[in-house]
């Protein structure tokens, strides 16, 4: 598990919170965790399936995503966060 913040990602930061925790699980599921509430948000397909099946308590990540400034009807991309968690998972 690792904490990341807006300071590290600048304008690419996709979240409404200033910092979040990234959790890379042994089964390959990736979750973003809100440190204030400990709510989990799935970041990949494995995590999404676990949420949908009720295996884990989580919410859709859209809840904590900022609007895309170039397309306000859409949410910001989480690609930079997915890249960061991939590196985290590979190093553990």
Residue ranges of model-derived segments:
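Mature extracytoplasmic domains of secretory-pathway proteins
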Residues: 3, 8-57
